[in-house]
Amino acid sequence: MGQALNVKLYLITDEECLQGKDLFRTVEEALQAGVTLVQYREKNGQGGAMLQKAVALRTLCHQYGVPLLVNDRLDIALLAGADGVHLGQSDLPVAEARKLAGPDFLIGATAHNVAEAIKAQRDGADYLGCGAVFTTVTKKDTVPLGLEGLRLICETVKIPVVGIAGVTAENYFAVLQAGAEGAAVISAILGQSDVKAAVAAFLQAFDHK
């Protein structure tokens, strides 16, 4: 892609949130409305089908000049020609992924606390997804990091930080005020009847930060 990483509004796909809507059409609506980064996430998908979707999403995202990342699966990200991968704490270590993918491949890492954030930065992550910032239905067993925890991470590391989990257009401003450069969003965009309006609400909040 050859462009600077922009994590302002980071869309993560989850087909369960689509409520019957078409994945590609919905992602395109979000791209048209101004999301700045897309992550293809499918926790229990089959490799071949995931690769096909990743290739299609990469093509779609690149039409709008937006990078595509793949959640967890470095192999699929590389084979699909995606721009990067996002790795959780139980996935392939960031340092090992960097060895395989090279210096120009985007690698994001999940961090739940300062220690994990420092390690991910040291190991070569380009950005951090930090949370859960707020309580959320999809992460019932997770103790929220909270805005203060997010602020502490933002003050500690030098790479961009994205707030994850429970972020809505209404609390997005508070996430930015804590020092995050953006937010990763699933249901607050994909689960809405008007995807473009949902994206616009986030961007309006960003413009008033």
Feature-to-residue mapping (PLM):
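C-terminal structural segments of small proteins and small subunits
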Residues: 181-182, 187
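Short alpha-helical segments enriched in small residues
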Residues: 146-150
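Conserved N-terminal beta1-alpha1 strand-loop-helix module at the mouth
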Residues: 1-92, 99-126, 142, 152, ...
